[in-house]
Amino acid sequence: MSNLDARIAELAAKYLPLASEMLKEAIRIPADYVDKPIDQGGDPACGTSNHEFPRIDYLRKKIVAIKAVRKDEDAYFDAFGNLVWRVEDPTDGIPSDQKKVIYIDGHTDTVKPLRAQWLQNTGGIDCFDGIIDATKVNKDFLNKELGYLPPESEWNHLIFGRGSADQLGGVISAAIATKIMLELEAEGALKGVIVYSYATVCEEDNDGAGPMYLNRDVFPTAAPAVVPDVVILTDSSGCSKNGALGIYRGQRGRMQIEVTVKGKSCHGSMPWEGKNPLEFGGAIVKEAADKYDQRIGFKDDKFLGHGTRTASWARLDTPSDCAVPEKFTFRFDRRLTIGETPEQSCADVEALDAVAVARKAGLTVEISIPTYTDASWKGYVLNNPQVYLGWVTPEEHPAVQAAVAAYKKVISPNVDGKVGTGGVLTKEPRVDRWVFSTDGVGYPIPKDASVPGAARKQWVNNGVYKHPAMIGFGTGIEQNTHKIGECLDERELQHSAAFLARFPSIYAGNA
């Protein structure tokens, strides 16, 4: 272990209490707004997509206060609403346009908190305030609900709350990491690199929204010193079976397929007078599920796994519950593996026998890809089709190799878990892939699109698209996310911050 390795590990341990404090507050903040009247500044959706401002305003102020940036103006909000902070060593003698540019990406929004359900099911845990009565905590529920929990004797390390596992811990780790890099600037922690940390918004509703904004409005005219060589995605990369803090190098893509079945409404006592879109639509859902169960029309990939399709959302337009409905709209969540395309995925739904049967019976069936039209908290509307591209960074890419090296230098000497023994911190680095989706889907662009300096930055070409090399490394167990009782083992914050603080200098060649 070099002196820089030892110093990074030492400071990451020193600042663990600070990281835990920041994470708890970032989780808690919506509690100040969700029950407050709107005319008094309240927001019942605070903390969810497009309602992140109170949380990221706290984070910006805290990042400045703890000296995770050199000066106040180095932490700011971009036009989309992402929180950005930047660190660089201006005295390292290397021109900015020759430095490696590292992005650390983590989203700040969460899924709906479901506060009442938390209290009802966990007994003594609030989705914002964490444990409020330890004597009432329903341990049996937590053990059944969550993918992994440490032994009960170690539960004092757990931080509970919506956003703990997915994925505020990654954002906090980035803040601690840039603080460490600045403190160890003289020892080479920032030599030859520029680090941009992005605390993005709207990821849960519209995966990759923050990076999509960058691709549209920033990268096409940006200086090379702004365009990333590598993106570290800090979404949850722990596995309940194989270990915490995996190094992930890919994920499947996903899309939404919307099906609208229009029928003819009538009184429920005379159903023969109408055409029931719910019944015909239900047949479409059933056939689609059967085809998926038989893997008809789905490809498989050795690394990313097979494509999937499941009904995920529905809306019924009906005059009453004693009538034949007028319209039934539902969506399929379609996960796309290598070799699958949005066009073919829509065509597969179009080709279902139940679609033809509905049309023959006189109903209208429309199949489309919906557009995301909601505005960010800053008022920016992307209007993007809800197609989110998968990506893979080759295992031999220098970014993956640097990630493995960073893990071995600052994490391996300080943990002793074994891969395959639950969601523990493992001594050996584990290179794998995500099951779910991340902000990474927002970075791929058409192969022929022009981005300054992309060629010399070793961007990855995947078919007709290209993207910066991406790796995943984040706190939280993937199988604990989006669940009642979501939690994080705070010890992951320490090692995640150490990794993020060490990776940039290794990638720049300062091993």
Model region roles, listed by residue range:
Residues D105-H107, A199, I232-D235, K262, ...:
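Short beta-strand segments
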